[in-house]
Amino acid sequence: MFNPMTPPQVNSYSEPCCLRPLHSQGVPSMGTEGLSGLPFCHQANFMSGSQGYGAARETSSCTEGSLFPPPPPPRSSVKLTKKRALSISPLSDASLDLQTVIRTSPSSLVAFINSRCTSPGGSYGHLSIGTMSPSLGFPPQMSHQKGTSPPYGVQPCVPHDSTRGSMMLHPQSRGPRATCQLKSELDMMVGKCPEDPLEGDMSSPNSTGTQDHLLGMLDGREDLEREEKPEPESVYETDCRWDGCSQEFDSQEQLVHHINSEHIHGERKEFVCHWGGCSRELRPFKAQYMLVVHMRRHTGEKPHKCTFEGCRKSYSRLENLKTHLRSHTGEKPYMCEQEGCSKAFSNASDRAKHQNRTHSNEKPYVCKLPGCTKRYTDPSSLRKHVKTVHGPDAHVTKRHRGDGPLPRAQPLSTVEPKREREGGSGREESRLTVPESAMPQQSPGAQSSCSSDHSPAGSAANTDSGVEMAGNAGGSTEDLSSLDEGPCVSATGLSTLRRLENLRLDQLHQLRPIGSRGLKLPSLTHAGAPVSRRLGPPVSLDRRSSSSSSMSSAYTVSRRSSLASPFPPGTPPENGASSLPGLTPAQHYMLRARYASARGSGTPPTAAHSLDRMGGLSVPPWRSRTEYPGYNPNAGVTRRASDPARAADHPAPARVQRFKSLGCVHTPPSVATGRNFDPHHPTSVYSPQPPSITENVAMDTRGLQEEPEVGTSVMGNGLNPYMDFSSTDTLGYGGPEGTAAEPYEARGPGSLPLGPGPPTNYGPGHCAQQVSYPDPTPENWGEFPSHAGVYPSNKAPGAAYSQCPRLEHYGQVQVKPEQGCPVGSDSTGLAPCLNAHPSEGSPGPQPLFSHHPQLPQPQYPQSGPYPQPPHGYLSTEPRLGLNFNPSSSHSTGQLKAQLVCNYVQSQQELLWEGRNRGGLPNQELPYQSPKFLGGSQVSQSPAKTPAAAAAAYGSGFAPASANHKSGSYPAPSPCHETFTVGVNRPSHRPAAPPRLLPPLSPCYGPLKVGDTNPSCGHPEVGRLGAGPALYPPPEGQVCNALDSLDLDNTQLDFVAILDEAQGLSPPLSHEQGDSSKNTPSPSGPPNMAVGNMSVLLGSLPGETQFLNSSA
């Protein structure tokens, strides 16, 4: 971007924009094209430190119309290649001290830069303006390009006006306005004359240690201006101008010898300079050496030369040479005296400037010229200001420097905008201040030469350049005018532009008041809404995006943990009601428990005291792993948990589901957090360890009185993305009345019961009352829907299937083998009513997930007493914890074998236990005949050894009774046996200590169904199989002794399970972290009765062994 003040191109010559690598170019040709036809380079080519100063392509300027004599013959331009590249870029870290890097280098480029000033005349010490550099053979204005280098190795060239001379690049502002400031330095714009002497100023005007903190991009500028600027040839004097002396000499050395011997030493009484036009105006010096040094200003003598190889620097004062030598050695003996500041400087004057600018902001050096109110921190900046702004004719004296009483500078925040610009008589109309848009903005505290707007480091504004910039509260734009002046335009246009620019700077300064020097950052706020408000739509929490980034990545890394805790990494809110008003205290506890487990602490918060007093809604169990199809971690299904209710693709065949067919095991509806009551176990829904029974017992006993309200979404407010599954929808079948899947309701991970556990989340149309069903006699068989797979009881119509259970026996689980296996499994692998006749030809509804192939229904002989089995036996939809892989490719024979194993085990274990403690009335238990399973003969005597039984079904059902803790068991009884519900375990786990099963005796009797609820209270109990309705066998049908059993109220005593079977099963594997039941497992070796039913008999040999042993 060009300087907006640059006038349009007026010449016809233009060079097409080109890209030329700089490192292969060297110095531009100075041939017949002249110095005016060279294209200028884009600013970006000068911003890299990798090429160093030497790689900078220096463009030439027009020497036509120069007011000064032509330069001496140029020295070899090979010197450019000797310059050492900087190891850093101006874009480097804001706190980097570029001067330190330069000075500490053994072959510092500063020495080479300083060697430019070898001309003896017209120099104010080290400063000279506008003269040709004798070291490089380029006009003096080109020397300012030495501090830049191309970063990209290319040089985009643009048309260049040959009449304006060299287009000089202003170092890019690193503020928001990163524009390329192009400037043209013309010799006619720069006044040249011998510099005014400052004999009393013992500070080092040539000091190279100055840091330009304010102008971060101008970091080598002060060195360049102080030591590198070539002195004009006019300063090289050979004629004596002493009053009354007009001798002429052939060399400068002769002139110097003449002055020292004839004029200085000849007048020993007073030390006064009588040089014609001397600005001291005959003011005497205090010592003779001061006069000698002063005369070097007139003669241009620089006797002190740098001794480093390749360095041609020379100085008129010894202290300046010493300071320069520190640039080679890297010595910085002058440490900042401010406490906490570790900056070091090579000379005391630089340290004083730093301390004034950075720490105290004192500006004792005030320009005393009429109409100028500029103030500076050091005399060198004042001298530079006077020369560049007021012209070479302006005299800088002690009075101008402010050597008298030093006025205290106003604080930075109270500095009034001083906007008087070049309007004085001594100011040249050609002087143009650098526009603020091209100025680097004040760094918010960085104390580095590479400061920028965006640098957050540091705590104070930086004005080490001594330049008070408009809008930046320090320095002056005039100080940079000799380096940054605009292109050559007419005097009238230049004045207009200058006035406009000054007016603009004034306005900006007024609109942008100077604040405190420290960096003020806004207080950090959480991205998005508060945590309690982020729990919005399901997808919003599932994916790790910027909108939900408040959750710790420690527990959002898992792709399966789409329901990672909504709490921030800190402690979850104890007062949940304030943050999540839509939740009950129990629900808040549940969230806190999930959060504690997700963090891996393993210690959820203790249950809130309000749980004991709370009524209201039940919370769905959070232990489900496969409450929606396609999410079955053990089945190899690759899906993201954040995709709700997505049916899974066809994975590899998984293990056959080992559902037990022992009836629906009813656990009382849990209170909001009843599933994890033990504070020593993980409570996250995706915790590697399932909950223990101990955690659940206490809350189960409480939860019997808290039943969910009809149609209530328990976890409202979008807390659970998967709470919107209805029981029918998760099962994939219609409702009991033949309706389609119900709309989503409060269902979450675990809303379906785990294994033989009850679902505590009920959708519309479900109640919490214990329901009963009419006697399934042949008269009313047709009353039940064809897809109902569970016997209804004799006290209610079949429409009550959607009701939820209400149990009366606290702490125990009721078992009804006639209702199939526990609910919570995915449709189907459960055998509803194991002793019933399916409706012949009744196909049953197909699963809603049409892309899951349905296994063909085996056709059984219809002549037998037990016709075709329900379709539910062959369904492949997975369900909670049962890990029956959808799209399973197991054959029908394997499924039959599975059913045989399940039912035989359940019936044998039912007979093993003693009478129920509750003394429930005896009722006969339906039994599934082997004929129903396709003719498979099941031994009615458990002749198989315990080892065989253990090998057949892994951990199997371990009978346990609360009344028999010593390991002895009573004789089998045909009714209401209390036993523990075994859960399938991985086949690789060691077999638990077996318990012999008693023999079974034949019995005769009709089927009678008790008053229990269907299938653990799940509204889909009975239609899990989605197959035809099952009916009891004809009256008088001779069947196994199990037919006479009435397990209507057979219950599971969790206390007995907890006491006896605590250490019978090994820990779950990580992949099977969630139990198939909603009964928690202990933190140690999980209870055999609480294992994962999803992986029992994962190997086919185990099934075969059991079938062979039971045949």
UniProtKB/Swiss-Prot annotation:
The gene is Gli1. Residues 546-562 have a biased composition (Low complexity). Acts as a transcriptional activator. Binds to the DNA consensus sequence 5'-GACCACCCA-3'. Regulates the transcription of specific genes during normal development. Plays a role in craniofacial development and digital development, as well as development of the central nervous system and gastrointestinal tract. Mediates SHH signaling. Plays a role in cell proliferation and differentiation via its role in SHH signaling. This is Zinc finger protein GLI1. There is a cross-link at residue 1008 (Glycyl lysine isopeptide (Lys-Gly) (interchain with G-Cter in SUMO2)). Keywords: Acetylation, Activator, Cytoplasm, Developmental protein, Differentiation, DNA-binding, Isopeptide bond, Metal-binding, Nucleus, Phosphoprotein, Proto-oncogene, Repeat, Transcription, Transcription regulation, Ubl conjugation, Zinc, Zinc-finger. It comes from Mus musculus (Mouse). A zinc finger (C2H2-type) spans 238-263, 271-298, 304-328, 334-359, 365-390. PROSITE patterns: ZINC_FINGER_C2H2_1, ZINC_FINGER_C2H2_2. Residues 855-870 have a biased composition (Pro residues). It is found in: Cytoplasm; Nucleus. Interacts with KIF7. Interacts with STK36. Interacts with ZIC1; the interaction enhances transcription activation. Interacts with SUFU; this inhibits transcriptional activation by GLI1. SUPFAM superfamilies: beta-beta-alpha zinc fingers.
